[in-house]
Design a protein with these regions (language model features):
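Cytosolic ends of transmembrane helices, especially the final helix of ABC transmembrane type-1 domains
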Residues: 332, 336, 351-355, 379, ...
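Transmembrane helix-loop-helix hairpins at lipid-water interfaces of multipass membrane proteins
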Residues: 162-215, 222, 294-299, 410-414
Length: 722
């Protein structure tokens, strides 16, 4: 098992080190999954993340700080934290310590290095992660090689691809008929004046050309069909997998980087479906060409054999040059795409703040960076093609030069020389293609790494879980809940809270107190570090996410509307919307009038993300969407912040009706007008419940809520005076 592991990007060093240590103990895991375990984000991985990831992999791990002498006593391999060039925080695997040097595995280049004591001492921060197999550790290999993945793509279509390959082989063999035809024409037909043989061979060549055309046509059709099927498998499979990934993935990955993987899927399809067939075909042509050349005249064939090592050297150099450059091309292209998507999604903000020049500069910087690496890639291609072309032309001249000498000496006939020359021309084309194939191979390999690392990530587990039905819903219990985002920001530490069924519960608190996080946890968007959240007697971990999220409807702070009409956005996910239900919900919310004033009423197209609506109208659509599903638990996260007083009154009346129907309503709000109708108010501060009671109780008790109440009351009075 390979112990050296190279990091993919600057944030990967910790995960790559952990993968290397795991490989030392015969455990192979994808680096992408270890990143997921470790909570690696745009800042990288911290020590806590490495320790927790090691635990999930079956190891016992501990982060320690030691002195220089301890470095020689600890069990190895271990992970050491260093600072490179006094700037870059980095992890390396400590392999061996001797009196003369420290041996490490550096994920920066994925290689072993022996470093002198003094040099390592300058870099080492004293921090180590000690790792050893635990009781639950098992030797296993969960990595899937690119070759196996490629075969899994090919296998369902191997019959069609084999037919295409067989047709291509026949096509290439028939192509060699031209060289035989030229030889016979010069040596037999022209000297003998055999007109009947000329006509016979001419007709045969016409038939061969027609047959080659038909073979080429059907091969192209087969490849087109197979390509579409592979595209469907890769692209749709990728999209379906994306939707099953946990929310943390989308928090840490930019949209442009996610979209760029679709381009990677196209590169993989191109390689699997077309290039691989052409590569096999070209190798076959080279073999057949050599056989024919030795058949015509072995002395000239030896000259051709001599140039094979030269072509091999060109291929090797091209491979070395392309390996690193092509990965950088894809990464910088993805970075540019991410910047473009981000800036276009924020076009309104850019205009409002006059950030056009700033945004242009950011985009231009990434574009120039991409152009620089594309230029290097282009130079590599020019070197490869020019070198191959030069060798091909020189060898052609050499063959004619030497061959003409043999023809003058009567060792070879003029027809055989021309036939040989024709085969040489047939030979040099595939050689150029094979060497050019190197870049496509690199592209496909890198694209496979980038795409399949997403497939390696663990999805939300839906197996062997309970379907939550409306009648199963009861009080909501948070029991000793401990949660943090990734391995950095702790939000809750032993949170205990009960939300009664059939009540309107308001959750108040300053920004950053954990209100919105509470909502996310209730929909099981994030995994808890410890504790339990129960609806009735059912732990959220034992419920399917689909059924949970149907029962719990949320109106979030940030509203996402889809490109479609009003009905599409209210009855989202319903292929046959219940118009009676849509109108009923809109009437309750007092929305019908404003919808009917739109150009096409309920069929009005809203534009991307509801661009044609005001903020308040968007919020009302979002509230209607949540109510359309008839949820047992409704959560409003600052959901009325953009509403006018009349619209808010309709929402409050609707919420009151839900209480009468014994539904649970949770309101996250700062505005007293929303909190005013709550049966109970919970006040959070720094992830803890600091106050819990009715509005009347909390408004007279000195504490955070009263200060907020007093502050808003003063603001209202001042506004009235003004």
């Amino acid at each position: 098992m390979k112990i050296t592991v190279k990091q993919r990007d600057i944030t990967d060093c910790g995960a790559a080190c952990l993968a290397s240590v795991a490989a030392w103990y015969k455990l192979a895991l994808p680096v992408a999954r270890i990143r997921q375990f470790a909570g690696t984000d745009k800042k990288g991985t911290n020590i806590l993340g490495l320790v927790e990831a090691a635990g999930k992999m079956g190891f016992l791990a501990k982060g320690v700080r030691g002195d220089w002498d301890s470095l020689f006593k600890i069990p190895k391999p271990a992970i050491a934290h260093i600072i490179v060039k006094e700037v870059l925080h980095h992890y390396v695997v400590l392999i061996k310590t001797t009196d003369k040097y420290i041996e490490i595995m550096d994920p920066g280049d994925g290689a072993f290095h022996k470093i002198e004591h003094e040099e390592f001492r300058k870099q080492w921060t004293g921090v180590l992660v000690l790792i050893a197999p635990g009781e639950k550790f098992t030797v296993r290999n969960e990595k899937v090689s690119a070759q196996v993945r490629f075969w899994n793509l090919i296998r369902p279509h191997k019959g069609i691809l084999l037919q295409s390959l067989a047709g291509a082989l026949v096509f290439s063999v028939l192509g060699l008929a031209m060289s035989i035809y030229v030889g016979k024409l010069v040596d037999t037909i022209l000297p003998g004046g055999n007109l009947s043989l000329l006509n016979l061979l001419g007709i045969a060549m016409v038939l061969i050309i027609v047959l080659r055309l038909l073979l080429s046509f059907f091969q192209s059709v087969f490849i087109l069909k197979t390509g579409q099927k592979i595209d469907a498998t890769l692209i749709l499979g990728y999209y379906q997998h994306l939707l099953k990934l946990p929310q943390t993935f989308f928090d840490n990955m930019r949209t442009g980087e996610i979209i760029s993987r679709i381009g990677d899927a196209v590169k993989i399809r191109l390689f699997v479906n077309e290039v691989s067939i052409n590569f096999i075909l070209n190798i076959f042509i080279l073999i057949v060409s050599f056989i024919l050349m030795f058949t015509f005249f072995w002395k000239l064939a030896l000259i051709m054999l001599i140039v094979v090592p030269i072509y091999t050297l060109i291929y090797y150099i091209s491979n070395r040059l392309n390996r690193k450059v092509q990965r950088t091309v894809m990464e910088r292209a993805a970075d540019l795409e991410a910047q473009l998507v981000e800036s276009l999604n924020s076009a309104g903000t850019i205009k409002r703040f006059g950030l056009e020049n700033f945004s242009n500069l950011k985009t231009e910087t990434r574009f120039v960076s991409l152009l620089e690496i594309i230029y290097k890639s282009g130079l590599n291609s020019i070197f490869s093609s020019s070198s191959t072309s030069l060798i091909s032309q020189l060898i052609t001249i050499l063959v004619l030069w030497v061959g003409a000498g043999y023809a003058i000496g009567s060792q070879i006939t003029p027809g055989e020389l021309l036939s040989f020359y024709s085969v040489v021309g047939y030979f040099t084309g595939p050689v150029t293609s094979v060497i050019g194939f190197n870049r496509t191979l690199q592209d496909a390999g890198i694209a496979a790494d980038r795409l399949f690392e997403i497939f390696d990530l663990e999805i939300e587990d839906e197996a062997n879980k309970i379907e939550l039905e409306p009648e199963m819903v009861d009080d909501i219990h948070f029991e000793n809940v401990k949660f943090r985002y990734g391995t950095r920001v702790e939000v809750f530490d032993s949170l205990n809270l009960t939300i009664k069924k059939g009540e309107i519960t308001a959750v108040a608190g300053e920004s950053g107190s954990g209100k919105t996080t509470l909502v996310s946890l209730l929909q099981n968007l994030y995994a808890l570090q410890a504790g339990h959240i129960r609806i009735g007697r059912y732990d959220l971990r034992h419920l399917t996410n689909q059924s949970l999220r149907k029962v719990v409807s949320v109106v979030p702070q940030r509203i996402d509307l889809f490109s479609g009409n009003v009905v599409d956005n209210i009855a989202v996910g319903d292929f046959t919307p219940d118009m009676n239900r849509v109108i009923e919900v809109c009437d309750k919310l007092g929305m019908t009038k404003f919808i009917e004033q739109l150009p096409h009423g309920f069929n009005t197209y809203l534009g991307e993300n509801g661009a044609t609506l005001s903020g308040g109208q968007q919020q009302r659509i979002a509230i209607a969407r949540a109510l359309y599903r008839n949820p047992e638990i409704l959560i409003l996260d600052e959901a009325t912040s953009s509403l006018d007083s009349l619209a808010e009154t309709f929402v409050q009346n609707t919420i009151s009706l839900l209480r009468e129907e014994n539904k649970t309503v949770i309101v996250i709000a700062h505005r007293l007008s929303t909190i005013n109708m709550a049966d109970r108010v919970i006040v959070l501060d720094k992830g803890m419940v600091v106050q819990d009671g009715s509005l009347a109780e909390l408004s007279v008790i000195e504490g955070p809520f009263r200060r907020m109440w007093t502050h808003q009351t003063i603001d209202i009075k001042e506004t009235v005076k003004t």
